[in-house]
Amino acid sequence: MKPSSALKAVISMDDGLLMRGAFYVLLAAAAAFLVIDLREISTAEAARPALDVMPNLPTFLPATTAPGAPGSPPVQPSSPEEVLRKPMTFNLVSGGVLRAEGTIDPGAADRFASEVEARGEYIKLVSLNSPGGSVDDAIAMSKLIRERNIATKVAEKALCASSCPIIFAGGVARSAEKDAVVGVHQVFNGSIERPSPEQAMSSAQATTARVARHLDEMDIGAGLWIHALETPPNQLYYLTPAEMSKYRLTTDGTHVAVPSAG
């Protein structure tokens, strides 16, 4: 067919047919980009450990550069990086305060449950200092905190980042002292296996849904999770005291969360 004939044929098509053709072209292009993106996700996920703290990144991440983000944290956390890198430890101190410090490694939830089982009647508050870690363990710890009517706190110059705010959200009363460093970003359920692109996408979606559902059950404002989803894993969205109050991450003594029914 001559170019002029082809042009006439296109012009003679009705608008609906032209729109359908354009749609299928765009759909094909989108599918091609999706395959590329899924392959990149699969490669990235395969390289990540089973934690959302990546070993090649510092525990104290830079602030997100997204428009409207509050910027840098109030202070540098006081704990050395080597302390925060260690698997989470639990230390019961005076006043019924259980200090939870370090990375939320796989198995942290089981150790926490054992601690609560052994000393539950003495534990009134969990004080957090963690760069994050295993999402599944964070959710399990958060649920147990709520079930046992325990409060949570981030102390002055302590760090609660990545999946740590999930634990924080479980407290029946939640406080962040002046200069507490609280940050969120995208979380994922990493694996040592090499998933297919479809498996990587499915895992990311399932983890996202699981965290969103849990935060909703804990009565945390949806805006908090939106900030997390908008922030890449190598950055943090550092929350201001006003934002923590707005999203009900802190209760400020005026709003006490109702314990979950389980």
What do the predicted segments below correspond to?
Residues 1-16:
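N-terminal Lys/Arg-rich, disordered targeting/topogenic segments
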Residues 17-37:
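Hydrophobic membrane-insertion alpha-helices, especially the h-region
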Residues 18, 49, 80-111:
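STAS-typified acidic loop motif
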Residues 42-79:
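Juxtamembrane proline-rich low-complexity "stalk" or linker regions positioned immediately after a signal peptide
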Residues 121-135, 151-158:
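Short, glycine-/small-residue-enriched flexible loop/hinge segments at domain edges that mediate gating
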Residues 135-146:
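Membrane-embedded segments
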Residues 137, 150-188:
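Glycine-rich beta-to-alpha active-site loop
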Residues 191-262:
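Charged, glycine-interspersed solvent-exposed loop segments at helix/strand-loop junctions
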